[in-house]
Amino acid sequence: MKILFVWPKIHNPIYKEFDMEKSLICRVAPKLVPFSKSLTFPILAALTPDKHSVDYVEGDFSQIDFSNKYDLVGITVTTASAYESYKIADEFRKNGSFVVLGGYHPSALPQEAKQHADAVFIGESEDTWPQLLEDLETKKPREYYEPTHPVNADSIPIQRNLQKNQSGFVLQATRGCPNKCEFCSISNMKFRYLFRKRSIEKVVEELRAHKGKSFAFYDDSLTIDSNYTKELFKAIKDLNKNFISYGNINVLGKDEELLKIARDAGCITWMIGFESVSPKSLKSAGKKTNNIEVYEKHVKKIHEYGMSIIGFFVFGFDYDTVDVFGKTTEMIDHCEIDAPLPFILTPLPGTPLYNRLNSEGRILTRDWSKYNLGNVVFQPKMMTPEELFNNAIEAHREWYKISNNVRRILRNLKFGVRTSLYTTVNNFFTKYPR
């Protein structure tokens, strides 16, 4: 069979569109900056027998060439990309392709997705993808493919590279998160709340297979089991690669051994969900792992070990008033967050947050294209939708003034070339719309 994987592009009104892989800085130093987008497709490609051909494309409807004929088209769908994905799927089906949709949105709303697909994947797909290929060969495909058990972490294969001139790649050493925050679409997917670890030997084998010098751990959090993470980092130290990773601020800040091992292994940046500067907001969201009182202390400790921080902040929790924007800006400046990223709280289908707001009659629209973390799609409790949106835009505008960008970049020079370069990219690609 001739197979095509499609990654639909979406646009966020808070962020100016920017093609990182075509930027000057990534042309100059492609081996220093880890960029990649899809984790699912390289894994599914590796699970596809060699007798099938596999192509990959990313873009919106206008950027895809529908003149090429494919037997099977797989599209990964987020809530924000749902309509664009459905449009792409419908066009491929008109051309006679068998289309499958998977991802977080189809997993939450499989019946909706089925209207635009021949088959829908619910949840993890490592076990069900091979089954689909067999079913197509026997001409007995199912309408829905859903795993009956969680994927064994060690059954995840070494990825197959689908992108030419890829400057970096992503992988997972662990899968799942037991915390189940109210707003999180990941931990509320079937089996994704179960924390699983790949054998360290498997992870090292995969890293050796990829010749690039930069990569990113896209684990839900690589600090859930810090003992495992320490052993993993020790094992990859001699590979001489640099990487970024998701982690929890409270775990990182109080474990100097982990920080030292991470730095020595090549970690240049931690991506951290601070989420809010309001204790009440964190508690209401179920974010039990964050302690605001130690933010500054822990950020300073991470910096002492030469690693930068990309900080994620969410606005719109029920206890948020208009004061939260100024307080967050003060915290970012005071703690010296290297690349702060603002998001508007978004109740994605399938999450407890969506179910609660829906039951309270506070969902304002079900236009999924607006569910991109940059629009207000629900009625906030302590401010108007307009106040939430406008203040989020203004906060982003303040955070990314040229003077603030330059100050953060200069401050990062002490961390070395790789870290300061990555900070530069993050500070100049996240520009507010003019």
Q: Can you say where each PLM-predicted feature lies in the sequence?
A:
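Structural detector of well-ordered beta-strand residues that form the stable sheet scaffold
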Residues: V100-L101, F121, Y144-Y145, I244-Y246, ...
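Short, solvent-exposed turn/loop segments enriched in Gly/Ser/Thr/Pro and often Arg
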Residues: D220-D225, N248, F315-Y319, F343-P352
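Acidic, low-complexity intrinsically disordered segments
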Residues: M1-H210, E387
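Conserved beta-strand->loop/alpha-helix structural units within folded catalytic cores of enzymes
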Residues: M307-F312, F317, M331-P340
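Radical SAM enzyme core and accessory elements
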Residues: K2-F5, P13-F18, D50-Y56, D135, ...
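Radical SAM [4Fe-4S] cluster-binding motif and immediate context
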Residues: D154-F312, K327-E330
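Glycine-enriched alpha-helix->loop->beta-strand junction motifs that scaffold or abut catalytic
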Residues: A117, R263-T269, C335-D338
